[in-house]
Amino acid sequence: MMPLTMVKAGEENTIKEETRRFLENLGFVTGGVVTVVSEIGGNMIVNVKDSRVAIGKDMANKIMV
């Protein structure tokens, strides 16, 4: 398990239970696939459930994959 900020662009990972509740409304669900599209200064653009979502560094650090 690691924070999303440690994932390389193009790499798919599975979201862990710890961050589930807050992120469900954005489409992040436990067991769901998240793919990092790009990362600049810790801020990330990710694909989740066929949508692109921009998330800040602080939030990305809370998403465990």
Residue ranges and their predicted role:
Residues 1-65:
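Compact, glycine-rich, soluble single-domain proteins
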